[in-house]
């Protein structure tokens, strides 16, 4: 069976990894992450359930998305803070600075 070249990437604030690998044609995004062995480098990473994307686009069903040659599978981390709450805090700070506080 033919093989295709893909990349699997994961990043923490202090450490990043980009793994290049060859996988059989027909491999899904989730399968590529499992085949990459990235979980060994990042203990605690839930490769079975973590959200995945390709070139910045979140995949709804990474188990079903068949990869094409040259694609980069990105492993996403959960958000640390609620984006709405962060915006509210930023707006409150800006308002307070404008009012001279």
From Swiss-Prot:
Source organism, top-level taxon: Bacteria
SUPFAM superfamilies documented for this protein: MoaD/ThiS (SSF54285)
InterPro entries per record: Mopterin_synth/thiamin_S_b, RnfH, RnfH_sf
One Pfam entry name: Ub-RnfH
Family: Belongs to the UPF0125 (RnfH) family.
HAMAP family, per database record: UPF0125_RnfH (MF_00460)
Protein name: UPF0125 protein PA4766
Taxonomic source organism: Pseudomonas aeruginosa (strain ATCC 15692 / DSM 22644 / CIP 104116 / JCM 14847 / LMG 12228 / 1C / PRS 101 / PAO1)
């Amino acid at each position: 069976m033919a093989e295709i070249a893909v990349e699997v990437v994961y990043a923490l604030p202090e450490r990043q990894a980009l793994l290049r690998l060859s996988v059989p044609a027909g491999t899904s995004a989730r399968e590529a992450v499992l085949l990459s062995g990235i979980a060994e480098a990042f203990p605690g990473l839930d490769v079975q359930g973590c959200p995945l994307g390709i070139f910045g686009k979140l995949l709804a069903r990474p188990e079903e998305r068949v990869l094409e040659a040259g694609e980069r599978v990105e492993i996403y981390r959960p958000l640390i803070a609620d984006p709405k709450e962060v915006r509210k805090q930023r707006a409150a700070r800006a308002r307070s600075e404008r009012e001279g506080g």
